[in-house]
């Protein structure tokens, strides 16, 4: 068991900021188009964090042109450029699935003062 932890430790990233559900984040994803590689930002609210260690993932939700879009990212993926925490949110739940049913201003999360 200890060997697995040692191998995973080498692959884990150490530049991940501390964030939790309810926070507004901007995730930069590395996209390859032909010979070029660029970083595509995806901005939204973290509605879920799942797993631990190398298998940890988080889901970000945003509304684009009236349609809800969710993307799930592995935290330690080499495809992620960087993660910026834009705003801290105050929530009482670990999973914010109820935001899927809300529209407009009701789908916002209160910020920490």
Swiss-Prot record:
This is Large ribosomal subunit protein bL19. One of its GO terms (biological process) is translation. This protein is located at the 30S-50S ribosomal subunit interface and may play a role in the structure and function of the aminoacyl-tRNA binding site. Belongs to the bacterial ribosomal protein bL19 family. One of its GO terms (cellular component) is cytosolic large ribosomal subunit. Pfam families: Ribosomal_L19. GO terms for molecular function: structural constituent of ribosome. It comes from the Bacteria. NCBIfam families: rplS_bact. Keywords: Ribonucleoprotein, Ribosomal protein.
């Amino acid at each position: 068991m200890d060997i697995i932890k040692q191998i995973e430790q080498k692959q884990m990233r150490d530049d991940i900021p501390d964030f939790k559900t309810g926070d507004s984040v901007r995730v930069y994803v590395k996209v390859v188009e032909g010979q070029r590689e660029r970083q595509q930002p995806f901005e939204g609210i973290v509605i879920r964090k799942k797993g631990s260690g190398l298998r940890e993932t988080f889901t970000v939700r945003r509304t684009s042109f009236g349609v809800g879009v969710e993307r799930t990212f592995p935290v330690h993926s080499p495809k992620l450029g960087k993660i910026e925490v834009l705003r801290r949110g105050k929530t009482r739940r670990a999973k914010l699935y109820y935001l899927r049913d809300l529209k407009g201003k009701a789908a916002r999360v209160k910020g920490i003062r």
